[in-house]
């Protein structure tokens, strides 16, 4: 279960940060 939750958390964090940092959107 943790293996599935980890990537989801990263994706969510990257998307939230992407709103403020356009550079991060490239990674998302």
Curated annotation (Swiss-Prot):
Keywords: Enterotoxin, Toxin, Virulence. The keyword Acetylation does not apply. Coiled coil: none annotated. GO terms for molecular function: toxin activity. One of 3 components (of 35, 45 and 105 kDa) of the enterotoxin. This strain was isolated from a food poisoning outbreak in Norway in 1995. One of 3 components required for cytotoxicity (tested in African green monkey Vero cells); the complex is not hemolytic. This is Enterotoxin. It comes from Bacillus cereus.
